[in-house]
Amino acid sequence: MLEWLNPVKGFGVTFHTMFKKVPTVEYPEVKAPTMPRFHGRHQLNRWPDGLEKCIGCELCAWACPADAIYVEAGDNTEEERYSPGERYGRVYQINYLRCILCGLCVEACPTRALTMTNEYELADDSRESLIYTKEQLLAPLQQGMEAPPHPMRLGETEKDYYRLGRDDNAAARADEQNSEAVQ
């Protein structure tokens, strides 16, 4: 009946939105902030004394659905210690040509050595530069940290490192409860 008015209604919607504020961001000049839980580039973390948290267990590589992570473990010695445990990640690479930034590797890491930053600008001109090595992924040394290799500074055994930040009384109570449950 009044079908000839349909194009006019469509133009009404167009004119109505023409005068609204544009939500477009001028990206290279103005960067929108990311959400706190955004999955961006990976980072290999360190203990407060500078030793690496990665123990070279390769669980992150096994959990990766895109097969983007390559880990090769090395043995720690008392002369050259890179992490508190027996082993460390001697070779660590993430291929960002394959990585889908899903975060499954972070969930698989038993020592919380691997986290994801908010950095999302990973584009580059060459394929070789998108394969990040351990040196590129390691968190920078903060004040008070010493570059590895060096002896353990935060305790005598690796258990001392893994108990950092935990309530020692709670750990002792848990040990007592476990021993009582076994008996």
Swiss-Prot record:
HAMAP family: NDH1_NuoI (MF_01351)
Entry protein name: NADH-quinone oxidoreductase subunit I
Binding residues for [4Fe-4S] cluster 2: C64, C99, C102, C105
Subcellular location: Cell membrane
Stated family: Belongs to the complex I 23 kDa subunit family.
Keyword Cell inner membrane found: no
Membrane topology: Peripheral membrane protein
Keywords, in A-Z order: 4Fe-4S, Cell membrane, Iron, Iron-sulfur, Membrane, Metal-binding, NAD, Quinone, Repeat, Translocase, Ubiquinone
Cellular compartments per GO CC: plasma membrane
The protein's Enzyme Commission number: 7.1.1.-
Domain of life: Bacteria
Top EC class, one word: translocase
GO MF term (any one): quinone binding
Catalytic activity: a quinone + NADH + 5 H(+)(in) = a quinol + NAD(+) + 4 H(+)(out)
Subunit text: NDH-1 is composed of 14 different subunits. Subunits NuoA, H, J, K, L, M, N constitute the membrane sector of the complex.
Basic and acidic residues bias (residue ranges): 153-176
Keyword Repeat: yes
Annotated GO biological process: aerobic respiration
Residue ranges constituting the 4Fe-4S ferredoxin-type domain according to the UniProt record: 44-74, 90-119
